Amino acid sequence: MPPVTTALIAANVAIYLLQMAQPSLAVPFALWPLGASAASNGQVSFQVWQLLTYGFLHGGLVHLLFNMFALYMFGGALEQVVGSRRFTAYYLVSVLAAAVTQLLVMALAREIYPTVGASGGVFGLLLAYGIYFPHNRVYFLLVPFPIKARVFVFIYAAIELFLGVTGTQEGVAHFAHLGGLVGGGLMLAYWRRGRLLRR
């Protein structure tokens, strides 16, 4: 497995173990809403480092395992194609884009709760995998047979949009997932534009 993918998985697992040992240590590193209203409730307010640190925290073992499996499944192949430096930048941009999206959603909804998880970065990887390996076949939980990666990306994004708009699955940051996907898409477009300009 490529080095950055390995390091990301190791870091997420190690940090999760620290969370389990001392849950309070993770609180200031989760993504909290903008403004002072969170602090007024005796909670932690937004800090700039949370835009990235939240992506290394998880809400439970299943949450962690799902994201790490996806990181292993999609990340390794992508890192080998784009290189470790670009892969790192791409992943972190996806995490950052997901965070910004979630902050906007929380501000509009006027809700105060922390957000954690690597899912924003994972959704960015999912998009890139579908673009770089469109004909590779992957398994989707709701479909009993493998489907092409590009189809998988479209279906999963559509489901996330539906769940986010309808609010039928609470406790999941669906728009943050989509934000990570969009952020990854913008990064890919930037790379493509750079290649075209150099021709």
Q: Can you annotate each of these PLM segments?
A:
Residues 1-199:
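A detector for small-residue-rich transmembrane helices and their helix-helix packing motifs
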